[in-house]
């Protein structure tokens, strides 16, 4: 059944659209399925149910991106194969907190 379905949206806006359509169709979140997004937008806490989301430090992401670009310029590199990681945090809210 639906209880075994988890939805992860690539961004919070996609999740908001999905949640709106699901609720209008009579589904209950998180009872029928759970959903989480990525961005941790301020709307996550306003929407009902509140959306679980992955929080990224976008300022740190920007700083790290600038350092990578500066290093590429300094080394006169045309390589685009850089992998970089920054910590993220999951903000668990009602959209994944089924009581059943």
Task: Give the location of each predicted region.
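Flexible loop/turn connectors
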Residues: 1-100
